Amino acid sequence: MLTDAQIIIRLTLSVVLCGLVGLERQVHRRNAGLRTHILVGLGSCLIMLTSLYIFDIYKNEVPLDPARIAAGVITGIGFLGAGTIIRDREGVKGLTTAASLWVVAAVGLATGCGFLRPALYATVLALVTLFFLRHIEKTVLGKEENGNHDSYKAVNRGK
């Protein structure tokens, strides 16, 4: 059984890590920002903590699999992420935000089960992807900075 201190640490770490990803989305004015990412991560962490708690209580009475609840979280976040995706004449927008919601759900699940270092590493890699690869996309690939992640500038600009 986890102590209150362990539970608080896991929940707080989930908020901090997922908040960092959400802050990047907020700064770039995406559909889902700081609060949404924090709530997805916090909820995922709490669901994992609850799953572990239930598993611990009933492990000798009923065969349970704590991973089943985690799988439900990932499926549910897929629906939430789909709500951030917008398709118009210019292309598709919101794919990166949908992916970031999926990542923070995984970070929340990882912190909830005590897999703290991988949760931290995944957050760092997500932030590197969101902050630094944006620059590479703009300069090397010629992507527009309008949130449209499926449209590219013409290769022969000015012709």
Residue ranges and their predicted role:
Residues 1-67, 116, 135, 154-159:
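Alpha-helical transmembrane segments and their membrane-interface boundaries
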Residues 10, 68-69, 114-127:
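Loop-to-transmembrane alpha-helix initiation sites
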Residues 15, 77, 123-124:
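Residue-level signal for the membrane-embedded core of alpha-helical transmembrane segments
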Residues 19-30, 79-93, 133-138:
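C-terminal ends of transmembrane helices
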Residues 39-49, 72-75, 99-112, 154-156:
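Small-residue-rich segments of transmembrane alpha-helices in multi-pass membrane proteins
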Residues 60-81:
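Alpha-helical transmembrane-segment detector that highlights a single hydrophobic TM helix
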Residues 125-135:
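Alpha-helical transmembrane segments and their membrane-interface exit regions
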Residues 137-159:
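Intrinsically disordered, low-complexity non-transmembrane regions of multi-pass membrane transporters
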